[in-house]
Amino acid sequence: MAENKILVEICCGSLEDAIEAEKGGADRVELCSALFLGGLTPSMGTIVEAKARLKIPFIAMVRPRGGGFCYTDVEMAVMERDTVAAREHGADGIVFGILNADGSIDEARCRRIRKLIGDRQAVFHRAFDVTPDPFRALDQLIDMGFTRLLTSGQEDTVPEGLPLIKRLIEYAGDRIEILPGGGIKLYNLRQVVEATGCKQIHLTAFKTQLDLSVRGRPFVTFGGALYPPEDQFQVADQSLVAQIVGTLK
């Protein structure tokens, strides 16, 4: 990789997304399910097929549910088993985050998952963005041996969090990678890179795909109260990924 190249990680909600992202030139993918909930653990079948079909690295999400990051003992047990299974089935890394009820990092539980990850990449996700003391939290992650932190700079989107992201990158040095992610689009890529000096970015690149199998009874819905169209779903857009990669050359 060229020294000044910006690494592009595409957030994917399915193996189909990951394959399209790779075709478009992505350097790495984050593999999840349920992106509407912020990303949950993908199925083991997805991870097995990802290992068989992808040439680029993929980082598997381990998150048992939406709605926060303070987990019960039962949820923690599931996360530990998912981490072991994802590693055994070939994931290049694990992305996760566990907080205490006050929003601080649950260091004891994070260390348990970190130990199971072993020599694979350990990534702390945007749970970081609700921690009360970002620099204390970053010190904890460094001490635990995390590879990388995904963050929007404790704001809703990266463009809003640019000042903190820049400070985090400067503070981290070469002790941990800082990966800006959240609200990055084709039109603001350059702004993010120039304002922060980041060496990698994390974003989605979707288009709408139709599934006509439900058109016969359009009044039947399967989702929650928002009732998204049942004949549509989002899939990674290979051409948009290629534009993103091309913009950063």
What kind of feature is each model-predicted range?
Residues 66-71, 227:
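A short acidic, helix-capping loop that chelates divalent metal ions and anchors anionic groups
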Residues 173-249:
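C-terminal alpha-helical cap/extension of soluble enzyme domains
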Residues 6-10, 29-31, 58-62, 94-96, ...:
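Hydrophobic faces of well-ordered beta-strands that scaffold small-molecule active sites
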Residues 2-29, 34-41:
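N-terminal pre-domain/capping segments
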Residues 1-11, 51-52, 217-220:
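N-terminal amphipathic alpha-helix/helix-capping segment at the start of soluble metabolic enzymes
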Residues 24-29, 54-57, 90-93, 116-120, ...:
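Glycine-enriched alpha-helix->loop->beta-strand junction motifs that scaffold or abut catalytic
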Residues 13-23, 70-82, 129-144, 168-170, ...:
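Catalytic cores of alpha/beta
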Residues 16, 35-56, 74-77, 98-118, ...:
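Active-site-adjacent beta->alpha loops and helix N-cap segments on the catalytic face
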